[in-house]
Structures are given as C-alpha cells and as structure tokens.
C-alpha cells in the first residue's frame, strides 16, 4: 500500500541532493525471515543485513550464542557487522560518564550505520555521484565471505549475489579505491 512513508522515500531518492538522489539505507530486520516494510518498499533502498563475528549471516545458531537472526531474501543488498558493535549511548544523565558507551549494540540496526557511513565516505570522495552509483560501488566492492554460493542472478545487476548475504560484506578499502578510479575517469585522468 502506498503511504506517506513511501512518498517520502520516493521523493528523496528522486530529488534529494539536487536531483542526484539521497542515499537511503535501511536495516533488513531481526526476525530471521524475509525483509519487511519499509526496507522492502523500493528496490533503490540499500538494505543491510547483520553478520555474526564468524563471517556468516547472523542467525539463531551462529557462533555468538545470541538467539536472533538477520532477515534476508530478495531485497537484501549487503552485510555489515551486527553483533556486539561498540558505540556511544547518550541516553543517560547530562555530561560524559562511563555509561555513555556500550559494547553490545546488536541487530541490523547496528549493521546499518556501517553502510550509511560507507556511503558518506564515498560521497566525500566524489560528491557528484548519484544514488545508483553509490549503491553500485557498495555492492560491487563487497567481499564474498562465508561458505555461501554467490552467483549471477537475474535482477541483481552488480555481480554475484546470495539470498542470505546479498552482495557480501561491505569493504571500505575496495569501495574507496573504486570511487577514486571512477572520479579520475570522469575527470579525464586515465
């Protein structure tokens, strides 16, 4: 069903950043099943799943001993670390305190900021890229990790893909290198 949320996503993808399109990144979800709304509402959204520390899709039987699982399926684009991610936690009292940090940020909500940050790095290197180009760089630079079979799949234009892992684990170094090469080529520096 078409909603205000869908309209906002569509508008930002089409018109954000002066017409280049805003990079929209959503968490896949933590139900160990199919990606759900709103992450599955537009194929231009970059959908992020969570990896376990053992290089596999986070699932209830993965090595970390936690009982949740990253959602997966047709809409999944890439994976990022999603178990016990260190981060700040500024919900407590005013000012800095030792409890302002956590070592246990979990779920696809902890994986998603890795990809949003990678998109920011890509745009810092080349702010003229459209949202499709950023998504392509993120997908094509991803590492094929784990014992999964990645294959060319109809409807997945950025290379080898897997139903549980998408295009694989994000790789900031490869993404930065691809962005630099693309920038130099577009400026005529072959």
Model-derived regions: residue spans:
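Substrate-binding/access-modulating region of protease and related hydrolase catalytic domains
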Residues: 1-44, 92-113, 125-128, 140, ...
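Extracytoplasmic/secreted envelope proteins and their assembly/folding machinery
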Residues: 6-10, 45, 66, 112-119, ...
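A generic structural signal for nonpolar/aromatic side chains embedded in well-ordered alpha-helices
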Residues: 12, 69, 78, 138, ...
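C-terminal subdomain of the subtilisin-like protease fold in secreted/lumenal serine endopeptidases
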Residues: 21-22, 37, 44-47, 124-190
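Structural recognition of the beta-strand scaffold that forms the well-ordered cores
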Residues: 22-27, 46-49, 77-80, 86-87, ...
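Hydrophobic aliphatic residues
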Residues: 28, 42, 49-52, 73, ...
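Acidic glycine-/aspartate-rich tracts in secreted/extracellular proteins
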Residues: 31-32, 52-55, 83-84, 123-128, ...
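Catalytic-core environment of secreted peptidases
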Residues: 53-110, 146
């Amino acid at each position: 069903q078409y909603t205000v949320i869908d309209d906002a996503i569509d508008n930002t993808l089409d018109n954000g950043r002066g017409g280049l399109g805003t990079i929209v990144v959503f968490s896949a979800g933590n139900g160990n099943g199919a990606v759900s709304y709103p992450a599955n509402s537009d194929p231009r959204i970059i959908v992020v799943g969570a990896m376990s520390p053992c290089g596999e899709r986070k699932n209830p039987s993965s090595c970390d001993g936690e009982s949740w699982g990253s959602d997966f399926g047709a809409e999944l684009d890439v994976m990022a670390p999603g178990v016990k991610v260190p981060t700040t936690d500024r919900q407590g009292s005013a000012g800095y305190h030792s409890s302002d940090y956590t070592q246990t940020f979990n779920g696809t909500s902890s994986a998603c900021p890795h990809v949003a940050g990678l998109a920011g790095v890509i745009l810092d290197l080349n702010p003229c890229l459209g949202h499709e180009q950023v998504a392509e760089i993120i997908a094509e630079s991803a590492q094929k990790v784990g014992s999964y079979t990645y294959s060319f799949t109809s409807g997945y234009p950025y290379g080898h893909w897997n139903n549980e892992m998408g295009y694989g684990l994000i790789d900031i170094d490869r993404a930065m290198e691809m962005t630099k090469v693309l920038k130099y080529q577009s400026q005529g520096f072959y």
